[in-house]
Amino acid sequence: QYCQERFIELVPNLNSFGHFERWLRHKPYKQLAECPEGFRRDDPFMVRDHGSVLKPNQNSLDFIDSLYDEYLPHFSSKKFNVGLDEPWELGQGWSKPKVEKHGKHKVYLKHLEGILSLVEKHDKSMEFWADVILENPENAQHLPSHASPIIWGYEGDHPFSSQAKSVAECGLNFSLAPGTANWRSFSGRWETVRKNLHSACTNADEYGAEGILLTTWGDCGNHQPWSTMYPPLFLGSQLTWRGKDVNDEKIGTFIDRTVFHSPALGLGQALIDLAKLDQIIGFNLPNNSLPWFALFSAQPEKLPQHLAEQLSVHELQNGLDWLNKISSENFSSENNPNAKLAELEWKLGIDLSIAGINHAICMISKGINSSKIANNQPPLKKRFQDIWLQRARIGGLHEALSLLEKALQN
C-alpha cells in the first residue's frame, strides 16, 4: 500500500535456489540441501556447516512452489525476482553425478526451467540474476524467451558492455544492476560507485536494457550506516533519469534539500567525503572497504601479510587524518530529526572506520598496543544497536551485533 500510494511497483523477490542457508541450516529442511552437512570453497573463500543451495530436483521445486503459494498473493506486481544467483556448492553434493555427466550449466538451466514453470503458474513474469548464465555467455541463447535476466556487477570495471551485448543479441528483455557499494563498508566507496553507475547506465542505454535496478545489500551483517546509501541513490537517480553526470557538490545539495529539507546543511557533502576514504588511503579491493576488511576478513590468518603487501602505515595514517578532518564538521541538525539521525549514522561510520584502520595499523606494525587502541574506542556496539533500532526492525540485529562484537574484540 505504501508503494502504491507513491506510484512505485514493489516487485517480490524470493531466493529460490542459492542463498537458501537460512532455511537449510534448520533440521526440518536439511534434506533439501545439495550439501546438508556443509561445504567448503576457495573463491570466494567460505566454509559452512550447513548448505546454501537446494538440490536441483522435484522435491525442491515442490517446496518452493509451496512458498510461492504463501508469498505471492501479497503482491500486485506481475514481475517476480526468483534470485538463482551464486549457487556456491552446486555439483559438490547431491547433483555431483549429474554435473559431471552434463555440466553445471545444463543442470542449472534445467532447474531454471522448472522454476520458470512455477512462476508462470502463478501468473507472474520471471526475473533472475544472470551471473551463472554469463559464466558462458553462449548460455543466453538457451534461455526461454520469457525469462528476464538481470546482469549485476558492482565494481567500476565490471564488463557490462560485453555482457549486455551477449544478452541483447538473444532478443531477451534484461536489466542492468549496479550497486551502491556501501555494504562490507562503514563509509561507502564513492570512486567505485561513480564508475559503476556510469558504466551501467551508459550500457543500459546502448544495448536497450529495460532499465536499471540499483541494488544495495547487507553482506555479513548490514554494518553500513543507512545514510551512506544516500549519495549513490541520488547519483543513480540523476544518471538514470537525466543521463548526465553531476559533480559532488550538486549531489550533496540534492541530498540536503530533498532528504533533510535544508539546502545549506552540508551533511550530503559530508556523506560523500566519508565515502572517499578508500580513495584517500589508496585501497582497492572488490566488494570491500579497508576498515571493514581489516575487521571482518574471512581469512584473518592471512590478513597481516595481505595488508602489508598493499599498504603502508603512512597510507593508513592518511585515512585517519582524513576522518579526523571531516569529523570536525558541525551541522545545524538539532531541530531536524531526520538530519540528526543521519548525522549520528555518519559519526558512527567515521568511528567504525577509525577502529578498522587502527586494527590494520596494529597488524602491520610492531610496538603498537592493540588493546590500548581498542580501549580508547567509543562504545561502538551500543551506538550501532541504538541507531539500528531507530531505522529498522529487530530482525537481524542479534546476528549483526554478534559479528560486530567479535570483530572488534579480535
Ranges and model annotations:
Residues 15-16, 217:
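Short, ordered loop/turn segments at secondary-structure junctions
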